[in-house]
């Protein structure tokens, strides 16, 4: 029997693998390494959110987890195209809009981690960090 191997870059495989109990420590390592959130907090408090909501006409978000005051969206981007940044910003905005109704004092931070299967920036770093924030 011939089997086809579906790559980890496939959205459904990406979500299935990273949300599996077998990969939980790996996911915790990724999130902690990128965000600085303590692994112990992630291990104790991380919950998976049903992320099967549509964010744009074709796409569902890949993997969404909540940890205390944070909502973290993990996205696999297979190819670069002109509107990719807009699409990723739309994901953040949708997650933020889902938090409406929470007290503004308690509204959770949304963090998006993109796994890009391309090198758009001609940069050898494994992690390139972009932030929308005020340093003051």
Regions found by a protein language model. Give the residues of each.
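Elongated, amphipathic alpha-helical interaction scaffolds
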Residues: 1-136
